[in-house]
Regions:
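Hydrophobic/small/kink-forming positions within alpha-helical transmembrane segments
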Residues: 28, 60-68, 90-95, 121, ...
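Loop-to-transmembrane alpha-helix entry segments
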Residues: 86, 102-122, 133, 137-139, ...
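Hydrophobic alpha-helical transmembrane segments in multi-pass integral membrane proteins
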Residues: 1-3, 68-73, 121-132, 178-192, ...
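C-terminal-most transmembrane helix of multi-pass membrane proteins
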Residues: 233-289
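Membrane-interface interhelical linkers
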Residues: 7-12, 19, 25-58, 131-135, ...
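Helix-helix packing/entry segments at the starts of transmembrane helices
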Residues: 82-88, 160-177, 213-245
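Residue-level recognition of pore/gate-forming positions within transmembrane alpha-helices
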Residues: 27-31, 87-91, 113-120, 175-179, ...
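Structural signature of hydrophobic alpha-helical transmembrane segments
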Residues: 18-32, 72-89, 135-149, 195-209, ...
């Protein structure tokens, strides 16, 4: 939807919108929808009441900072190199989840994470981007910092939900804070009003964005970070499928198809009964009689 509204798709659009305008309306619509949902439960104050205001604040800051660093990276570094350097994010996330949250990282999850990272690597081929890179400045640190901050955001989300915070509350706090920030680019670039042609798509985009944030938080309420991480790589498959259905774009490289297959295997590994992997785990040696 963002690609279509910004004029980057082959589908016709009379007046493309700037990215910052799309993001502003997406966040505003998402905030209004999640507010209406909480209000309908008649527990608005109760659900938004929190005993961890500073942890909420820290999480919101990390989310906003991560987005800012990501967009700043795209300003100074080619997209392929930003994506390449961002491949360190799953590794940082796993380390943070194991060291900070003390999550289980058994053989089954290790295999799934390794497969998902490998599949993403095959699709994006960050090695080619880095080999061809001519940028050797501090700008290269920006996507690395963004990856670190996004990983910290996942850990903070899981920690808040472990302390019985509501997934809807986390979604509301995030969108309510980020929506006003979306106005900042307009102070520099100027306001661009959407037309009636844009409004249905912006409404759909805002709804899907709010749903995605809520689903993300709900998932982290129900499962550990190390378990959910391989499923995040599946978005590459979904994006490829959406590109085929909407834009008629078919992956043409063998690496792309191989990467999709490997990521699919990573999610299948997590569906296998854990008892199967316990057979291969290290067992204590029997004591001598």
């Amino acid at each position: 939807l963002v690609r279509y509204l910004s004029g980057g798709s082959p589908l016709p659009l009379d007046q493309p919108l700037p990215i910052y305008t799309i993001m502003f309306f997406q966040n505003i619509i998402g905030m209004l929808l999640i507010s209406a949902w909480i209000w309908k439960t008649k527990q608005f104050k109760l659900e938004l009441n929190t005993n961890r205001p500073w942890l909420h604040t820290f999480r919101i800051i990390t989310a906003a900072l991560g987005i800012g660093l990501w967009y700043l990276s795209l300003r100074y570094i080619p997209v392929t190199q930003v994506v390449a350097l961002s491949f360190i994010a799953p590794i940082i996330t796993v380390l943070a989840a194991v060291l900070i949250l003390r999550e289980n990282f058994d053989l089954q999850r290790k295999i799934a994470v390794i497969l998902s990272i490998s599949g993403g690597f095959l699709i994006a081929r960050p090695d080619r981007a880095l080999i061809n890179s001519t940028i050797y400045s501090w700008y290269m640190l920006l996507p690395l910092l963004a990856a670190f901050v996004f990983s910290l955001d996942k850990v903070l989300t899981r920690e808040l939900l472990k302390q019985y915070e509501s997934p809807r509350a986390l979604t509301w706090y995030l969108l309510t804070f980020i929506a006003p920030l979306s106005l900042l680019p307009m102070l520099y670039y100027g306001w661009v009003s959407p037309t009636t042609e844009h409004l249905p798509w912006l409404l759909l985009l805002g709804s899907l964005g709010a749903l995605a944030h809520y689903a993300f938080n709900k998932a982290y309420e129900l499962a550990e970070v190390t378990f959910l991480l391989p499923f995040g790589a599946a978005k590459l498959i979904i994006c490829a499928l959406a590109s085929y259905i909407i834009f008629f774009e078919i992956p043409k490289t063998f690496d792309m198809w191989l990467g999709i297959t490997v990521i699919t295997l990573s999610t299948m590994v997590l569906s296998i009964n854990a008892k199967f992997f316990n057979k291969f785990s290290k067992q204590p040696l029997p004591l001598a009689s």
